[in-house]
Regions:
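Glycan-recognition and catalytic cores of secretory/periplasmic carbohydrate-active enzymes
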Residues: 1-151
Length: 151
């Protein structure tokens, strides 16, 4: 079941951007935002599924998707203080960042508590599976933001 779920999730991977697209940009309320390839910080919670699918199946495709997504999120979703944007919209072909904003938070430049927690969990998980210290460092920076910004 985990591998089947990972196969399904992998259909949302956009190789040109190196990310897992969160929503269909042309449907429902998302269609009114002008997005092409919206990616939400919530997706960091999905990476464990991909790492586990690689462990269970031996297919490194899932691992590679998880690492690509984590790296692009690390590069583009965070402000200088390590708070995260809720949504980053990419050009799906080139990977260029088109917009950084919120869909459910207070404002585009506000920090969203759940999003910060998802980033913390996601990068801790990435470190656990890859042993790449950059993920542990990112998790620590996100933790420091959460700890030092209680309101």
């Amino acid at each position: 079941m985990i591998v089947e779920a990972a196969k399904s999730l992998s259909t949302r991977f956009r190789p040109g951007a190196g990310v897992i697209q969160s929503w269909d940009a042309d449907k429902g309320w998302q269609g009114t935002r002008g997005w092409k390839c919206p990616v939400i910080i919530d997706n960091m919670m999905n990476l464990e599924l991909l790492f586990e699918a690689t462990r269970l199946s031996g297919d490194s495709t899932y691992y590679n998707i998880a690492v690509s997504h984590a790296d692009r999120t690390l590069k583009n979703h965070f402000r200088a203080d390590y708070s995260s944007y809720h949504v980053v919209d990419y050009d799906p072909e080139t990977g260029e960042v088109r917009k950084r904003q919120t869909a459910q938070g207070y404002a585009d430049e506000s920090a969203w508590a759940r999003g910060q927690a998802w980033a913390l969990y996601g990068y801790t998980t990435c470190y656990r599976y890859t042993k790449d210290k950059k993920y542990l460092d990112q998790a620590q920076k996100v933790y420091n933001f959460i700890f030092n910004n209680k309101n």
